[in-house]
Amino acid sequence: PIVFFHTEFENKVGEHRLEVVFNKSGSAAGAVSENHFSSIGRACPAPVLNTVAEKADLQPLGHEAPSSRYPCQRFFYSGEEVYFNSGLPEFGQAANQVSYTILRAVGNLSRVRLLGRGGGAGPCLLTPEANCLGPQEVSYGWAPLALASLTEEPGFAGLDEPDAGARQLAEIYEGNLRGFWLPEGAEPAALEFLDRSLFEISDRRISFQAFYQAGPDNCLVLRLLNSSGQDLKLDIG
């Protein structure tokens, strides 16, 4: 159910931001993006993606100018659609459009003209390599959020909730992460375990983050994330 995009281009210009823009199938009040340890929702600030003229609007004294671009990890979703990326941590949103920043060309770490930021945004250093001149490749994806429920066999809870569905589709976009245990010094034949899952989580509102050994008895520790905001009970088998 996922559309995969792979874009190749040659950047010949410095000091700019290049985006890929999606027209949404319908308007939405905002977007929700995956961030560290949680998902964060943001209201839509404008009917269209910000233009230079809109960015130039003066802001009341003591008030921060609204941001037009936001951070994300693997995905964000808006309305009935979810958007994935491979290493593209910035997106934009409007009522009927969303965007991914696929290149930021930056020739200076900070400029002396930014006197309003006491000391600037950092040392005034030239960063010509950060203009990323030359051939570039980026990957990203799109899917209807409703199709998440078709990715699993019946019996798993939570896929009808947007955040759980988006996370499930993100796993498919990246390639499902499987946990498996190999004995020390295992022969290559042990790779047959790759087709088996070490455990299964019954509720897709709980996502698997990591597992490792810890403690004097080398117990197996599972790190899980509950992004639903609810108290949940689940079976791990």
Identify the residue ranges that each predicted region occupies.
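Terminal accessory/anchoring regions of large secretory-pathway or extracellular enzymes
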Residues: P1-G237
